[in-house]
């Protein structure tokens, strides 16, 4: 059996209750997605340039950006049914499409994963503000994992906000 394909989740997919409610509404099992650990999608920033009919406002996307930018999120494993459900939830391939990415775990390990990115035809050239409820789902998911929310707050207000990493700590560099 091959190695698992990991899913990098960001945005509302960081909220377990939102995922579970979406699954239950469709008679599906939410345990088809299991969290592994927190992770960062490097050289990307979050954008709100897509209007979700289901959310009634802007929905999160990740876009390739300058070196030193990063989007916090989480790595998950999905069963085959989990991938089918996630594809359906994300409107794959018409709204969001699967994209291979490399993420860095909180432990510093580089991991190959798949995430979902908004199709160019669905992107708007202006900021599409999310609802307060949708932003709260994302914020709560980040806070639960002790991940920063500054990038989220900026991207809600500015289309071209940068999710810049402005500090680095390297283990083993301290001397006594």
For the regions a language model picked out, list residue spans one by one.
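Glycine-aromatic micro-motifs
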Residues: 2-176
